[in-house]
Curated annotation (Swiss-Prot):
InterPro entries: NA-bd_OB-fold, Rib_uL2_dom2, Ribosomal_uL2, Ribosomal_uL2_bac/org-type, Ribosomal_uL2_C, Ribosomal_uL2_CS, Ribosomal_uL2_dom3, Ribosomal_uL2_RNA-bd_dom. This is Large ribosomal subunit protein uL2cz/uL2cy. The keyword Oxidoreductase does not apply. It comes from Saccharum hybrid (Sugarcane). The lineage of its organism: Eukaryota, Viridiplantae, Streptophyta, Embryophyta, Tracheophyta. Residues 1-22, 225-273 are annotated as: Disordered. One of its GO terms (biological process) is mitochondrial translation.
Length: 273
């Protein structure tokens, strides 16, 4: 993609880049308002998720995760910015007049043609069942349950790999390093999600992060003892414990939060790293 490089002495825009091909003009029939209530609070108004609040107003774009336009080719018309996710989205015009948004596959440009269904070519942006894909295929937007829509590998730069097929199940290596089983009847999209370098983007200032709805993160060691187990002491004091803890006293940095008995444990062959 063509990129525009800012050359200014201002820290907020210094060395910043903008994709010239990426626009932000959503279609009216594919967007709707979404009331963001609470912003980290529960029904009683108590903070349950810290560091959330503020943020610019957003319109939700309806993304086609199911890809159920079978055997109808579509053309990429625009590549757009979506404020609700870190991946770009692209507008597809199908041959029957239908218009939908999908996640932008890496390398896809305006004018490319995509299609979904069985026995379709193994090319970037096409969606087909895992049973029709060869081993080693890079995929994203993977279904867990047939017909429910893609739920795995949807973030910017995410890509999974099909490593084995046996019986009715396929073995996938997910971006987290987890190896799990998925039904071969589930759909997946060929390729990698675009906007790969989003994690290397420099926001430049605190205000840019506030626009994203993220509030400042304060270290526990600079708090008072009443607010955090790491707090207190004279001057620049250590945490005073053998291991770091959360604000509620539980072990931090490596504590597993997944439920011990979950229905999907039998489908996970290797835990994530």
């Amino acid at each position: 993609m063509a990129k525009h490089l800012y050359k200014t002495p201002i820290p907020s825009t210094r060395k910043g880049t903008v994709d010239r091909q990426v626009k932000s003009n959503p279609r009216n029939k594919l967007i709707h308002g979404r009331h963001r209530c609470g912003k980290g609070r529960n029904a009683r108004g108590i903070i349950t998720a810290r560091h959330r609040g503020g943020g610019h107003k957003r319109l939700y774009r309806k993304i086609d995760f199911r890809r159920n336009q079978k055997d109808i080719s579509g053309r990429i018309v625009t590549i757009e910015y979506d404020p609700n996710r870190n991946a770009y989205i692209c507008l597809i015009h199908y041959g029957d007049g239908e218009k939908r948004y999908i996640l932008h596959p890496r390398g896809a440009i305006i004018g490319d043609t995509i299609v979904s269904g069985t026995k379709v070519p193994i090319s970037m942006g096409n969606a087909l069942p895992l049973t029709d894909m060869p081993l080693g295929t890079a995929i994203h937007n993977i279904e867990i349950t047939r017909g429910r829509g893609g739920q795995l590998a949807r973030a910017a730069g995410a890509v999974a790999k099909l490593i084995a097929k046996e019986g009715k199940l396929a073995t996938l290596r997910l971006p987290s390093g987890e190896v799990r089983l998925v039904s071969q009847n589930c759909l997946a999209t060929v390729g990698q999600v675009g906007n790969v370098g989003v994690n290397q983007k420099s926001l430049g200032r605190a205000g840019s992060k506030c626009w994203l709805g993220k509030r400042p993160v304060v270290r526990g060691v600079v708090m008072n003892p009443v607010d955090h187990p790491h707090g207190g002491g004279e001057g620049k004091a250590p945490i005073g414990r053998k291991k770091p803890t959360t604000p509620w006293g539980y072990p931090a940095l490596g504590r597993r939060t997944r439920k011990r008995k979950k229905y999907s444990d039998s489908f996970i062959l290797r835990r994530r790293k």
